[in-house]
């Protein structure tokens, strides 16, 4: 078949497959365009979790992992897997970056751990914190404080009280550490430059000012939050105090801090807030995006100086802070193979997923490759996306329609965020609206691509919206799933000529694209073309 132009890769974020049910917002939605594409063109299901994407067995996938695997055309072993192995073989306890932080703290200073406290495995894992606490004990650090960020998004909404109780048990077992503050991830892990949220978290961590109150027992604080209808993700930052009502452990000048989140996108902003006076960049972060707004919202003179701030992974290539697990360099990924063939490609997403179709899709490289253009559509300014389930999908469809009509691009990579971002609310009606909005956009894109003689690959990076009710509790499920996702090959006469093989994974998408585009597949790509040519006699 002739090379289609353009080839459009559509990533329906959070659009997994599960049998129809009252918990499946995708099956409950009216989606005539998607259903027709599924009927008229070759399709299969592919894996997006566990060992298929470089995660521990049974671990649900996520957007970062998904886009890395898609763009790399191979299984990319994730930081969680690397850290798990380092704990297992004890190399983590000999890591020089961590030893330097421990040595700094053992010199009469305080050591602070902070990050997402859960077993969700998307941004962090509580087992990593437990290992760090053991290491601090072994290295003679005396004053250790933990500032947990509560999850409720990649875990059940009220599991946080269990995680805090488990943490306190571990601290008693090891004889080290106290919980100093608690913040919902909504505040401490924002990624949309909403500095007012980070201010509430940093006020608790730095100044002992808790908008959510002061508690001797953090479990009591969490339970009171639940009683007010506020679940883990949205817990208003509160401070833990001693018998004299004094904050137990605020971050002070010269302290050591270790952010134990391994996923970068939601660790970046809190790092920018806290490390501005501690060598985050040569210019103290002043050259970074929205630095003036940050300094106006959280004045620089209110931030501690000379922190020994350590990042678990590389949160931003511009940061000059110590890193525990440095990034791998991926070569011969789809992006540089397209560049080598002088192919023009466009990346399109709204704010929430822009980094995924650019930075993560490009193997952790921020700078665009030659021939690569990017179009960012602003996400709506709402507290949570169930309030605006349409998000900016129609704006994305506008961009794609214009780009296809113009005929300037060989490849277009697009992410529709709705099913994932609204699915995280755990609310079925708005998630149905989100799915139906994306379906309408699919119809628009298909019409213009067909008219221009192009082709589409429709898939997802992980599941979410297909499982909105927790089967054990009967309550809302806000986390991703381990379900497979659809993969549809939309092209003229595709159903006559091709079938798609089963048991594929995200690593197979780039090889499939290269097969369609006629680009030789490099040996570094270990995925395989998902197409089976029915016209070739065996």
Swiss-Prot record:
InterPro entries for this protein: Alkaline_phosphatase_core_sf, BPG-indep_PGM_N, Metalloenzyme, PGAM_B_sf, Pgm_bpd_ind
UniProt binding sites for substrate: 123, 153-154, 185, 191, 263-266, 353
Binding locations of Mn(2+) 2: 13, 63, 461-462
Presence of keyword ATP-binding: no
Pathway(s) served: Carbohydrate degradation; glycolysis; pyruvate from D-glyceraldehyde 3-phosphate: step 3/5
GO cellular component: cytosol
Molecular function (Gene Ontology), one example: phosphoglycerate mutase activity
GO biological process per UniProt: glucose catabolic process; glycolytic process
Binding site for Mn(2+) 1: 420, 424, 480
Family recorded in the similarity comment: Belongs to the BPG-independent phosphoglycerate mutase family.
Listed name of the protein: 2,3-bisphosphoglycerate-independent phosphoglycerate mutase
Organism expressing this protein natively: Koribacter versatilis (strain Ellin345)
Lineage: Bacteria, Pseudomonadati, Acidobacteriota, Terriglobia, Terriglobales
């Amino acid at each position: 078949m002739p090379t289609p132009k353009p080839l459009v890769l559509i990533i329906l974020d959070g659009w997994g497959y599960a049998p129809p049910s009252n918990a499946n917002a995708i099956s409950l939605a009216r989606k005539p365009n998607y259903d027709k594409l599924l009927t008229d063109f070759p399709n299969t299901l592919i894996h997006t979790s566990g060992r298929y994407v470089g995660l521990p067995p049974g671990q649900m996938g996520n957007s970062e992992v998904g886009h890395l695997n898609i763009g790399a055309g191979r299984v990319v072993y994730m930081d969680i897997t690397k850290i798990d192995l380092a704990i297992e073989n004890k190399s983590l306890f000999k890591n020089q970056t961590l030893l330097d932080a421990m040595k700094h703290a053992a010199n009469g200073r305080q050591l602070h751990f902070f990050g997402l406290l859960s077993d969700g495995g998307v941004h962090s894992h509580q087992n990593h914190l437990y290992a760090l606490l053991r290491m601090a004990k072994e290295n003679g650090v005396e004053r250790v404080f933990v500032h947990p960020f509560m999850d409720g998004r990649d875990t059940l909404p009220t599991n946080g009280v269990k995680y805090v109780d488990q943490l306190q048990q571990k601290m008693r077992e090891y004889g080290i550490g106290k919980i100093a503050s608690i913040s919902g991830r909504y505040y401490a892990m924002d990624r949309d430059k909403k500095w007012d949220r980070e201010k509430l978290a940093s006020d608790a961590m730095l100044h002992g000012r808790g908008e959510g109150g002061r508690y001797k027992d953090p479990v009591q604080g969490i339970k009171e939050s639940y009683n007010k209808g506020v679940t883990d993700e949205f817990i208003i930052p509160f401070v833990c105090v001693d018998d004299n009502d004094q904050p137990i452990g605020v971050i002070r000048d010269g302290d050591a801090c270790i952010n134990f989140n391994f996923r970068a996108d939601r660790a970046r902003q809190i790092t920018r807030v806290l490390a501005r006076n501690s060598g985050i960049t040569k210019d103290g972060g002043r050259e970074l995006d929205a630095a003036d707004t940050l300094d106006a919202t959280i004045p620089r003179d209110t931030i501690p100086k000379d922190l020994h701030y350590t990042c678990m992974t590389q949160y931003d290539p511009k940061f000059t802070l110590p890193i525990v697990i440095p990034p791998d360099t991926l070569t011969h990924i789809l992006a540089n193979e397209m560049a080598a063939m002088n192919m023009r490609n466009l990346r399109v997403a709204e704010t929430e997923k822009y980094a995924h179709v650019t930075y993560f899709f490009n193997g952790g490289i921020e700078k665009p490759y030659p021939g690569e253009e990017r179009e960012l559509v602003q996400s709506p300014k709402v507290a949570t996306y169930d309030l605006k389930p349409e998000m900016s999908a129609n704006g994305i469809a506008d961009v794609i329609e214009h780009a296809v009509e113009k005929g300037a691009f060989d490849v277009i990579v697009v992410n529709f965020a709705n099913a994932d971002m609204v699915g995280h609310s755990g609310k079925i009606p708005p998630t149905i609206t989100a799915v139906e909005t994306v379906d309408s956009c699919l119809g628009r894109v298909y019409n213009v691509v067909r008219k221009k003689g192009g082709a589409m690959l429709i898939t997802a990076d992980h599941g979410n919206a297909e499982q909105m009710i927790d089967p054990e509790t009967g309550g809302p499920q806000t986390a991703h799933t381990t379900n497979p996702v659809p993969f549809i090959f939309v092209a003229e006469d595709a159903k006559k000529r091709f079938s798609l093989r089963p048991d594929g994974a995200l690593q197979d998408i780039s090889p499939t694209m290269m097969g369609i585009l006629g680009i030789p597949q490099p040996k570094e790509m270990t995925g395989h073309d998902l197409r089976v040519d029915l016209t070739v006699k065996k």
